[in-house]
């Protein structure tokens, strides 16, 4: 029998690609002159850069399913089905990965989310060890750590906003209080604000469902609901009286929201459905077969969704690039097919028995770190002399130089982390 797949390097590679896209967009957005931003070339750069956030969110959902499935197996149950007495509540723990995914804002000061991706072992989990009452079921217990992780990511989003204010020169308690509490700056919604609750929600769906089939169906249903409801939510006047801090999570508006639940949270649930499919594979042969279906199915979804954009809108007026369900599913199709492309790319050297260093995988396993350090470097005081001052070709060159520096920081971070782990294990 062929061995069960280990850590899935192709998911790390895909997350690394999201990191590169994120840095690409942030550097160009921050440093390019307004004149060049009005050019057609910059529009295409923005189109490419806009895929960073969906990939991060999508892979965060994949990690939810892989992590929970790994914990459930270690507890002695099969992820494909749960005993009849398995009860509800959520959970989530990074079982095949590390932190949770990344993201990519468009314009404005972004906030990336980011999450590991693939398969690492995770300790077994019983309802008692998860802090749940006995009888709630092993699936609940396996999912619960991921629910908590989603909550921590949301807290991280708030802390990141406060850090941005401190590094921006607003260091007094009075200034921070006025900006973050009175004016509600910490309530601004960015990628991590959406990613955290969406991860928790995807874990709840995973923990409540009793079989892999129901987990897939439930995740797809929720993802579709976010996509199809987006045009109506954007135009629904009944939401106008809501406090800005709440409305900003439902739909974007100037000055407060870069991302919102509709439709962005849907990418996490779409990724969770794909993660369940990957987690069900029992050996590398089965996983290779599944990846083939991802390639064909992703391209088919991509094409059909693009064609549907030419038909009448069934869910009210929509903007293709911002609110149309068809564009949501176009991106999902591209990302599903992208998994197959990353798998094939990662398999090339292994066909020759080699395992060379991969900058993309390195970025993938340190994505949160890269996000955390690069945002202030790109948008903060360090780059103030070149902000909005570079022609597009020079911005592209600056991006390559900056990306090289980020790779060096990533390697340094990994080296230090390994030394710390080695000392602790002595």
Give short role names for the model-derived ranges.
Residues 1-81, 88, 97, 132-426:
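Alpha-helical transmembrane segments and their immediate juxtamembrane cytosolic regions
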Residues 87, 98, 102, 109, ...:
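Intrinsically disordered, low-complexity repeat regions of secreted/extracellular protein precursors
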């Amino acid at each position: 029998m062929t061995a069960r797949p280990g850590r899935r390097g192709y998911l790390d590679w895909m997350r690394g690609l999201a990191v590169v896209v994120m840095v690409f967009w942030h550097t160009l957005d921050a440093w390019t002159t307004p004149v060049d931003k009005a050019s057609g070339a910059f529009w295409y750069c923005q189109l490419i850069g806009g895929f960073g956030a969906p990939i991060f969110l999508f892979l965060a959902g994949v990690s939810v399913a892989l992590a929970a499935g790994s914990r459930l197996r270690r507890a002695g149950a099969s992820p494909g089905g749960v005993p009849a007495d398995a009860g509800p509540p959520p959970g989530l723990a990074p079982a095949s990965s590390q932190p949770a995914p990344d993201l990519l804002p468009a314009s404005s000061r972004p906030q990336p989310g980011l999450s590991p991706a693939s398969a690492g072992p995770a300790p077994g989990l019983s309802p008692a060890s998860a802090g749940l009452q006995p009888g709630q079921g092993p699936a609940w217990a396996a999912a619960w750590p991921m629910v908590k992780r989603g909550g921590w990511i949301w807290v991280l989003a708030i802390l990141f906003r406060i850090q941005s204010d401190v590094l921006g020169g607003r260091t007094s308690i009075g200034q921070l209080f006025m900006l973050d509490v009175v004016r509600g700056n910490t309530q601004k919604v960015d990628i991590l604000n959406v990613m955290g609750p969406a991860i928790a929600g995807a874990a709840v769906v995973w923990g409540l469902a009793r079989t892999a089939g129901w987990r897939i169906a439930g995740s797809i249903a929720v993802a579709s609901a976010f996509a199809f409801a987006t045009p109506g939510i954007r135009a629904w006047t009944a939401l106008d009286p809501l406090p800005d801090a709440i409305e900003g999570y439902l739909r974007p508006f100037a000055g407060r929201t870069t991302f919102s639940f509709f439709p962005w949270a849907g990418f996490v649930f779409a990724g969770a459905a794909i993660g369940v499919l990957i987690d069900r594979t029992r050996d590398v042969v089965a996983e290779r077969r599944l990846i083939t279906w991802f390639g064909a199915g992703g391209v088919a979804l991509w094409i059909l969704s693009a064609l549907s954009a030419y038909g009448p809108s069934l869910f009210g007026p929509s903007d293709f690039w911002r609110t149309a369900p068809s564009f949501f599913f176009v991106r999902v199709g591209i990302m599903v097919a992208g998994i197959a492309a990353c798998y094939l790319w990662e398999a090339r050297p292994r066909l020759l028995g080699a395992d060379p260093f991969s900058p993309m995988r390195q970025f993938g396993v340190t994505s949160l770190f890269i996000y955390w350090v690069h945002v202030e470097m790109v948008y903060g005081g360090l780059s103030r002399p070149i902000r909005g001052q570079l022609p597009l070709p020079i911005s592209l060159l600056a991006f390559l130089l900056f990306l090289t520096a980020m790779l060096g920081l990533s390697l340094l971070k990994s080296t230090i982390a390994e030394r710390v782990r080695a000392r602790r294990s002595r």
